[in-house]
């Protein structure tokens, strides 16, 4: 792997993690029939951030933010890394 391909591969992996987390968070919201206001309170963010999440705007979120939001809402997280 060259230095030129490393950032692209990292961005792809990061994107996949963010998209996966956001899908789970949207499911959490849907399963509980939460309004944007309810979800914002549960995740500890503004309603506009919830609308961005529900719209799948993954480029607006970093993994750390999504982890913190999920934790505030009481979601259980697991990380699996394999080779």
Regions found by a protein language model. Name each.
Residues 21-24, 49, 65:
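Hydrophobic alpha-helical segments typical of transmembrane helices
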Residues 63-79:
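DNA major-groove recognition helix of helix-turn-helix/homeodomain DNA-binding modules
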């Amino acid at each position: 792997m060259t230095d030129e391909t490393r950032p692209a591969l990292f961005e792809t992996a990061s994107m996949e993690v963010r998209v996966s987390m956001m899908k789970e968070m949207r499911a959490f919201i849907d399963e509980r029939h939460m309004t944007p206001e309810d979800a914002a309170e549960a995740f500890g963010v503004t309603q506009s951030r919830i609308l961005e999440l529900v719209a799948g705007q993954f480029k607006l979120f970093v993994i750390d933010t999504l982890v913190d939001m999920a934790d505030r809402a009481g979601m259980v997280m697991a990380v699996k890394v394999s080779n």
